[in-house]
Swiss-Prot record:
Main localization (coarse): secreted
Subcellular location: Secreted, Cell wall
Lineage: Eukaryota, Viridiplantae, Streptophyta, Embryophyta, Tracheophyta
UniProt entry keywords in alphabetical sequence: Cell wall, Secreted
Protein name: 62 kDa cell wall protein
Organism of provenance: Solanum lycopersicum
Length: 9
């Protein structure tokens, strides 16, 4: 699950 702030993606 990725967070809404998926800057690390």
């Amino acid at each position: 699950e990725v967070p809404l702030d998926d800057t690390g993606l």
